[in-house]
Design a protein with these regions (language model features):
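Amphipathic alpha-helical assembly/interaction segments
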Residues: 1-147
């Protein structure tokens, strides 16, 4: 399978996987008890959603390798936090072992992909494929001329 260069964070397999896991967390957390709405449910959803958001931010900071790696590290920490909340939900009986295993498998895969990106950060960083710049404008003043 040939690899193509990503033109956007949305093209990254790790980002797509993070979105998939986030949606699964949202779906399964709908069944959590109401009393967990502002604690376990909220925390699990926020952590899961943050994984993809951190990947997107890393992409935006890839011009600077240290910033890129820092954001990917944050994404990895968020996937680990999500694993924690999956474990809490399992322990409380809110998640089936099968759902917990599926989520943890996806999260661990995300962790491996993120760590691979961190190890190969230099291949993602440097000059971006695009340069944003304004057109050269001519500025005139109302100063009187010598004519």
């Amino acid at each position: 399978m040939a690899l193509e260069h990503a033109k956007s964070f949305k093209d990254l397999r790790v980002y797509k996987k993070a979105r998939e896991v986030s949606q699964t967390v949202f779906r399964v957390s709908k069944t959590f008890p109401k009393e967990e709405m502002y604690s376990l449910t909220d925390q699990a959803r926020r952590a899961a959603r943050s994984v993809g958001a951190q990947i997107a931010e890393a992409w935006g900071k890839r011009r600077y390798e240290k910033h890129f790696v820092s954001k990917l590290t944050d994404a990895d920490a968020e996937q680990m936090e999500t694993q924690h909340w999956v474990g809490e939900a399992l322990d409380c009986g809110y998640l089936s072992p099968a759902d917990a295993a599926q989520l943890n498998s996806g999260l661990e895969e995300i962790g491996r992909m993120l760590n691979s990106m961190i190890e190969k950060a230099d291949s993602f960083c440097g000059s971006p494929d695009y340069v944003l710049r304004e057109d050269v404008l001519e500025y005139f003043t109302n100063a009187p001329t010598d004519d």
